Regions:
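Single conserved hydrophobic/aromatic residue that forms the stacking wall/gate
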Residues: 235-245
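A conserved segment at the C-terminal end of the G1
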Residues: 2-16
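Active-site catalytic microenvironments for nucleophilic, acid-base chemistry
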Residues: 9-13, 73, 207-214
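Acidic, Mg2+-coordinating active-site environments of NTP-dependent enzymes
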Residues: 58, 78-85, 100-188, 201-223, ...
Length: 245
């Protein structure tokens, strides 16, 4: 939902946006969207052939191969922003090869323990590796783990913590976002339902606040984007790169 909201707001702002997510629900093409539309078969086949020819004897996993192909395709799309969803964890994920301009960790939960570790501290360490030195690193988890905070500080990332740097408040009709220097009030609740949607939405608005000099968005675009009910997804861009785990 974080990427879905971010994509919708940026599209409502008139930006040309690409989105890479996984897994797909029905068709593989769902993994790559440009301006809100899934790419065509021909678009994918051309990029698959490009990666197959370039890899030589290098062995690639399914996810590595498809990630490289889709990123290669996005390079030709004259994008303003590209949203990339991390597949698993962060530190060793293929998506992490992108040097993101902004990164979002929405939560640190016990998941995929056989690969990421069986504690929140271990998983937080893996996820924190999508952060970059000197760039916004958004953490929307209300109880951030020490390993994530320590790594962000050790590399000199611009760490934004929920409850310290940004927050939200709300009543039955509307909610409000408060950041370091931006406040957004009278917001309708996100079309995407769920217990964590305001946490996710506040993380999105924190990322947009952090990137506002490169990707300015209006209050109208935010309201319009939050009202759109899109498939759950995630984020990163190379003209305004944002990563999400």
């Amino acid at each position: 939902s974080t990427c879905a909201m971010l994509e919708a707001i940026l599209l409502a702002s008139g930006y040309r946006v690409a989105l890479y997510t996984s897994p797909h629900l029905v068709r593989f093409n769902e993994r790559a969207r440009v301006n809100g539309q899934a790419v065509q078969d021909e678009w994918l086949l051309e990029r698959f052939e490009q990666v197959e020819q370039a890899r030589g004897d290098t062995s690639l996993t399914y996810f590595e191969f498809t990630t490289l192909a889709i990123l290669a395709g996005f390079q030709h799309e004259s994008l303003d922003a590209c949203i990339l969803e991390v597949g698993l964890g962060g530190r060793l994920d293929a998506v992490n090869l992108i040097d993101a301009d902004c990164s979002i960790v929405t939560s640190v939960d016990i998941d995929h323990a056989e690969y990421l570790g069986d504690t929140r501290e271990a998983i937080g360490f893996e996820k924190a590796h999508i952060f970059r030195a000197g760039r916004p690193a958004i953490c929307a988890d209300p109880v951030p783990v020490k390993s994530l905070v320590d790594h962000a500080q050790s590399i000199g990332a611009d760490l934004w913590l929920f409850g310290r740097d940004f927050n939200y408040s709300g009543d039955r009709q509307q909610w409000a976002y408060g950041g370091r220097s931006v406040r957004r009030g009278s917001l309708a609740y996100p079309a995407l339902r769920g217990a964590n949607q305001l946490l996710n939405a506040s993380g999105v608005l924190a990322a947009l606040e952090a990137m506002r000099m490169r990707l300015p968005v209006s209050a109208q675009a935010i309201r319009q984007g939050l009202a759109i009910d899109r498939k759950s997804t995630r984020l990163n861009s190379s003209h305004a790169n944002i990563s999400y785990a």
